[in-house]
Amino acid sequence: MYGWEMLSFNIHDGFLEAIVRGNRSGLLTAADYNNLCQCENLDDVKMHLTATEYGPYLQNEPSPLHTTTIVEKCTLKLVDEYKHMMCQATEPLSTFLQYITYGHMIDNVVLIVTGTLHERDVNELLEKCHPLGMFDSIASLAVAQNMRELYRLVLVDTPLAPYFSECITSEDLDDMNIEIMRNTLYKAYLEDFYKFCEKLGGATAEIMCDLLSFEADRRAVNITINSIGTELTRDDRRKLYSNFGLLYPYGHEELAVCEDVDQVRGVMEKYPPYQAIFAKISYGESQMLDKAFYEEEVRRLCLSFEQQFHYAVFFAYIRLREQEIRNLMWISECVAQNQKNRVHDSVVFIF
């Protein structure tokens, strides 16, 4: 924030900002990850984590441990921290924090609908949902047969309701339509969040708009690569891209006609901020692209802590915790499956 906004920031939000900056110091370091990567079994992983801020959440877990247990308990810490922030927050910070959870809501909706389509048990699916994206009527998603029913029966009373305006059709729910729904919802959500941050102004708008633009560009690349070789038309692909970001609009026009990964690479290398990402990847491969994007995201998230008096630190902290949990899930899976030679493949160091 700038000028007079800076003078009043601490009155309402200074305490929470200090809490978040303090919590950030509890994120795992490169030394922690190196120790975790040397573990022989999941009990060793638990032993190392009990010496960190995850200790109280894991110390009473009996053996034998499972990867899902470790991830669940580490996620519980993130949820507790988020709830603490929400309890202390006043407007407009409380609305900003709610926006952060909408992405998880979308993922949960897609998880339930996809699982139901493949005749999975609803209770089993609910256990896999992210706790930050839960809402009261989520179990009722299983009864919907098409987008219109999904909206009318369940989602009309949730924060996702405004994002469904472009999704409401009478087409039956199948795998392709569900993925289109996910990306259409994400597009509407990111555009709405972007506009909200613009209204907040100051450093919050400056930093958050940059972070959200990066997210929109990453999603555009992923949509393009994942739709290569499918029946999705160029026009349909173009409609799924968010209407902001560094790639908007000319990069989107080029991505919409790409037919292989190397063509996507050719488009992205025209944009200097993304050249370093694709320089890490060999021609013709996309397996390591996710890690390269995550590394760039972590770099940008860490930079947001260099300024004060803005809300982006709350977004950045939650995203960094989520990345840390992804790291722990990967390490735990590699240890559990005795694949220690691959343990560094997907770990993204934060510090």
Curated annotation (Swiss-Prot):
GO CC, sorted alphabetically, is: proton-transporting V-type ATPase, V0 domain; vacuolar proton-transporting V-type ATPase complex
Query: Among its keywords, does the record have Magnesium?
Result: no
Instruction: Please report a single Pfam family linked to this protein.
Output: vATP-synt_AC39
Source taxon at top rank: Eukaryota
- Example GO biological process: vacuolar transport
Sorted keywords for this record are:
Hydrogen ion transport, Ion transport, Transport
Q: Name one GO molecular function term.
A: proton-transporting ATPase activity, rotational mechanism
Q: Which InterPro entries match?
A: ATPase_csu/dsu_sf (IPR036079), ATPase_V0-cplx_csu/dsu (IPR002843), ATPase_V0-cplx_dsu (IPR016727), V-type_ATPase_csu/dsu (IPR035067), V-type_ATPase_csu/dsu_dom_3 (IPR044911)
SUPFAM superfamilies named among the record's database cross-references: V-type ATP synthase subunit C (SSF103486)
What is this protein's function per UniProt?
A: Subunit of the integral membrane V0 complex of vacuolar ATPase. Vacuolar ATPase is responsible for acidifying a variety of intracellular compartments in eukaryotic cells, thus providing most of the energy required for transport processes in the vacuolar system.
What is the annotated quaternary arrangement, including any partners?
A: V-ATPase is a heteromultimeric enzyme composed of a peripheral catalytic V1 complex (components A to H) attached to an integral membrane V0 proton pore complex (components: a, c, c', c'' and d).
Family to which the UniProt record says this protein belongs: Belongs to the V-ATPase V0D/AC39 subunit family.
Protein name, as recorded: Probable V-type proton ATPase subunit d
Organism lineage reads as:
Eukaryota, Viridiplantae, Streptophyta, Embryophyta, Tracheophyta
